């Protein structure tokens, strides 16, 4: 009497069955070194906030595109975006970055000119955001001060400034922070951020 053949497990191939046991991948970072290369939680959180803000800027830009085509944008959506942008990033996000930048200058005096530029950019972005929010409110209400050209220019100025600013932070300042700040610096920055939240 012959024994019944067992069918191979579905989805497996000869190569999969003969693969070596799982172990560290070639080029994988050992666990002991992984923490040294991973961004600190603060940088990760700031990056997540930037990604969310970038999505909102895309939404805003689509509405401005309608204005460029002489169509009526969704003023309520634009207002919602800018209400958020002038409440959360301006009041909570930028002050957290300022704490990181302050520590960078303490560790690397050569970064001071760039940090001053970024701190001034925070002030400028806040002003541009308020100007844009006002222009959107006029459009929403349809009042005599509503001017699509003013709104379009204000939106382009705000979107362009904020995108450039976030790019500088991602490409230069966040990597520099990871390079020069110590573990104790990150703990201090984190503790000082708590009241902001």
Locate predicted features.
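Small-residue-biased structural context
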Residues: 2-197
